[in-house]
């Protein structure tokens, strides 16, 4: 039986309607100042439990008062434009109503965490990269959330133990990474070029499987 489902956040359960890319703007400002801005700088921004200004300070990016305000406004505009996909709201409700545990497992910077939690107040479990200091597909992030939920991944052939699924739009982070940790990862193809194209369909596949297993037991 499937006992838990992990969801990616951006591109899966939420979308950004007005992208301003404040962190990308910050990194560009650092390069403009002659700083060495590397992929590790971006990784730090996603794994540090720091506000936006704290990231700039840590990376040594000097911001004038006007530039700081400009980037802060860009961040707030992007945050305020985040909205849930309607199919995500329905799918999560259907899974939870059936007794399946639901969690969000996502790579994101600190300001985005409260927004996700606010949009889905009924989701109790979260694994956010900025809180854990690692990003997907590091196996620790998947193991952490499974531990929080009290589920044990890796039991696909043991009918006595619950199985854990994940779905998202990244092959590396939401399919391959989870599978390496014993979680059956699935890809969401919102462009309709794949077997799973929306989360309502995914939820019904999960519920149908559990129903079939109950009837066969």
Over which residues does each language-model region extend?
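Asp-based, Mg2+/Mn2+-dependent phosphohydrolase catalytic module
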Residues: 1-7, 15-17, 62-65, 89, ...
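Residue-level marker of alpha-helix boundaries and capping positions
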Residues: 43, 82, 164-166
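Short, contiguous strand/loop micro-motifs
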Residues: 39-40, 77-79, 129, 161-162
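Active-site neighborhood of HAD-like aspartate-dependent phosphohydrolases
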Residues: 1-40
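Metal-dependent phosphoesterase signature
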Residues: 49-90
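Hydrophobic alpha-helical core bundles mediating ligand binding, dimerization, or RNAP-core interactions
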Residues: 20-31, 47-52, 71-79, 112-116
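Acidic-and-aromatic substrate-binding clefts and catalytic sites of carbohydrate-active enzymes
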Residues: 45-47, 80-83, 134-136, 194
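Alpha-helical substrate-recognition element adjacent to the catalytic core
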Residues: 30-58
